[in-house]
Each structure stands twice: as structure tokens, then as C-alpha cells.
Amino acid sequence: MPNYKFIAGDKKWWRQAVVYQIYPRSFADLNGDGIGDLAGIIDRVSYLKLLSIDAVWLSPFYPSELADGGYDVADYRNVDPRIGTLEEFDKLIEELHKVEIRVFVDIVPNHSSDQHEWFQAALKAGRGSPERDRYIFHDGLGENGEIRPSELVSHFGPTGWTRVTEPDGTPGQWYLHLFAPEQPDFNWDNQEVRDDFIKTLRFWSDRGVDGFRIDVAHALTKDFSDGLPARSTMDIDPKLPDGSDPLFDRDEVHEIYREWRKVFNEYDIKGKVEQAKVLFSQDVESTFVEQMLVEGESDIDLQFNIMLGETMQIDPQKTFSAVKARQRGKNKGRSVSYTHLRAHETGRNLVCRLLLE
């Protein structure tokens, strides 16, 4: 384990925290190659301290082909060599902890890069293999499987399915991707997938990371028992009961995060110094957040709301409803954080923070 400094204090420090997001590839370029790097962040630690922030949130720094700004992760337990090394990451944690700034990192569990070793193994292994079961593959429709399995769009394009070439060179199965074709979705019913992400959480926690921001937190678990979904948008089907949409906001996703919480609880009790880990998510769908906050789920510590910024100027009623939903959470004793009226997905003309305590 790297030799880093723990920060003592209140385990609920994040209730009042100011968190500063850093996109490492553009924040500071120390070696002058045109790409931001970890060394550049280390060089700016004194500047970050002057901002009086409590934590930084590092957007993906993992090896990636950058089909989606680094959210297509090729290796979850490494640093992209274009921006640094694991040793430099350890140094960054050490320097930030010296000035009592904690560190959150992005974790991207819904999908990997198509260059991830698991997906490459799935392409080589063929139909029905354990390697393919880590992802979501389906046969196509039509006489030769040439028609995609369902009329499902993705967030980034007209279809959520892409066909692969089988090991023998023939056109083959299709894989699901809710985002870019370079981002195949994991199969979270596969125990190997679940175990490997636990391994990833421990890997970064042992290196001193103080918390994780979950990308696409509401989309991990999927249910195709009633057939593959066909839809023209990526919105939750309003006709379905809460927690039963086949793609998003399913009740089962909280089982995953409760398992993660068990891992983090191990760090809460180690040693005599503060090592508590924080788990937070991006608020996309209100039912996901209301279950977490109002029903008192103990899996995710807090969330930030980008939808607030998207609706504030165009739909005051939706903004009011969003605030009321989180106020119900506040009345149940949970911390509710509204942050990022603008984030990495949106234009950055305004950033603010509002805490309801």
C-alpha cells in the first residue's frame, strides 16, 4: 500500500464539502506535450488549496481510446500513460492529503471500452462463451441474424446494438451499448463482473482515494425477461411502475451499491485514523434518488443533480418538483447536495452549490 496521509475528522465531512471537478487531460500540462497530466495537477496543488475546497473529483484518467472523453475505460486499475503513471497518482494523493484535500475518482461500471481485454476476449471466444457472458450479446433477427435485436436507440446514436464478426469471419451476434458503439454494456448479472469491480474499488481505496463518483449509476441492472426493449428515446417508460423499467432505475441496482458499501465500511473501522470512503452518484432519474434519500437506503452517501441546471431556465415546474423531491429526503435526515448546474456533459457558464441541511 502506498504511504499516504490519512485525513482525520468527521466521517460526514462531505455534508458541507465543496468539491472541485478536474478533467486531468485539460487541467494542466506540465511536460508541454499538449495533454494535461497528473504532474500538472501536482504542480497546482498550492493553487487548489487557495480555493478553500474540501475535495477534488478526478474525471477519468484511465487508459482509454477517448471515444467518450475517457468514459470508455480500457483498464480500470491503471493510469493512461499519456497523462501519467501509478507512481504519479500516488504522489498526487499524497500531496493533496498533505493540504487536507480529499480525492474522489470517477468509476464507470455500466460499460467498458471495446478495447478492454474482456471485450476483446469476448470477440475471440464466440457465441455462448463465458467471455461473452460478461457483456450483453444477442442474436439478431431475420433469416441470418442481419436485423438488430430490437429498435433501441442509444444516447449517442440511432441504435443501441452493434454487430460483431465471429472468430470464423462470418457476421455474428449483436452487443448492447447504451452509449457509443465503443462502450459495450457490462452484464451485471455476471458474478465475475461484480467481483472485478469490488477488486477495482479496493485497488484505488488502498491507494488513498477517499470516494467514488458512479457514472450512469441508475443503469447497471437490466431485465429482458419480457423481451428486448424497443424505444426511440433513452427515457424511462412512464407507463411502468417505479423500479421496473428494463433498462434504467431498477430496484436491483441498490443491491450492487449495498455490496460496495460493505467494502467501504471495512475502511471505516481500520486503524485509529479516518479512512471512511464516500460513494456518490449523478442524479438522472428522480425515482432512483428518491429511493436512495426518502426510503433511507444506506448505499450511496450523496448525489449531485445536473438535471437542475438543464431544467432551471426552460421549465420552472420541473425545477420546483426536483427541489421538492430532495426536500423530502432532507426531512428524512439525509444530506442532499445540489451541485453542478454545469458539468463535463454540458456547457460550463455557471457552477454553484446548494446544500440543504
Q: Where are these predicted regions, by residue range?
A:
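Hydrophobic residues within beta-strands of alpha/beta enzymes
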Residues: V56, F212-I214
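Hydrophobic alpha-helical segments, chiefly the membrane-spanning helices
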Residues: L350-E357
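Conserved small/polar residues in nucleotide/adenosyl-binding loops
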Residues: T339-T346, L350
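Short, compositionally biased segments
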Residues: E274, V336-Y338
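Outer-membrane beta-barrel transmembrane domain signature of Gram-negative proteins
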Residues: E310-A322
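Aromatic- and acid-rich polysaccharide-binding/catalytic face
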Residues: E297-Q313
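Glycoside hydrolase catalytic-domain groove-lining segments
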Residues: A322-S335
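Acidic/aromatic-lined carbohydrate-recognition and catalytic surfaces
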Residues: P2-R202, D206, A219-Q291, E295
